[in-house]
């Protein structure tokens, strides 16, 4: 519930905004937005989730409204405030303008940090591997793990400059802080990635730009990110951001969120490709039947082909818009659900009959 102290902090922040923001104009819609956000986050509405969707026209002062209300509440609940924008332009505006203003008028002290994806930071180990001891030797060029082709002189100069800048602490390690960023193909060779990262086991861990940035974010009250980073981080198990239970999320320009969520949380497959692949396996299936003297595999393959055709026919009758069909909120039709369950069982049965036994 909203305590008297919290209400006073929100009012004080709002009063501060009136004096600190130039050309401030009091709007009733902005006042209502502050009130509704505050009541929702503090569970003033019983039996509802603390989620609110706010739609307001340009010029309402939405950013100021959610900062005035959310900053004191996040501090009170001991949670991180994660502000996710839809694009880089808005992210920079929030970072360089809105948050800076909020530091002046907010009734609570807070620290903020910008969160970026791991690939925006250099991996020191990779950078050193590509620049160490190759000034008079061509051995490194032959190492396919480091180079798929001989690097150009310009590539090497870029790498040496980055290594020197990082060593002298004149470069933060973020690609966005470079005056002349390298080509993407070169950057990918030295960028951080979760597949090769040794984390605390790496000898350069204490000097790692990515982990230093993550440490700064973990010590901050407000984290400025973007939709893609938040969604990707949820999928990857909170490698960059704190656990979702420890955060209050603000999705600015949330009308972009549904499309971004679809791209992150969906996977695809072609029924026609599956049917073609199954037909191409026919020769191998015939060999298996000869060896095992069992027609069970062929029977399962035929059932898979039939189920895929039935699924394809059903899907082709749906009314797609721009190659997308969104099912109603009540769920996927039983016909599709039953067919996919049937295919799952059939595929597993095929694997059972075609996989070698432990005794083979």
What positions do the PLM features span?
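Hydrophobic "anchor" residues on beta-strands that sit immediately upstream
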Residues: 51, 80, 222, 248-249
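Signature of the SF2 helicase/ATPase Hel1-core->accessory helical subdomain module
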Residues: 205-219, 227-348
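Walker A/P-loop
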Residues: 47-66
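N-terminal pre-P-loop "Q-motif" helix
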Residues: 25-41
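Conserved small/polar residues in nucleotide/adenosyl-binding loops
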Residues: 353-360
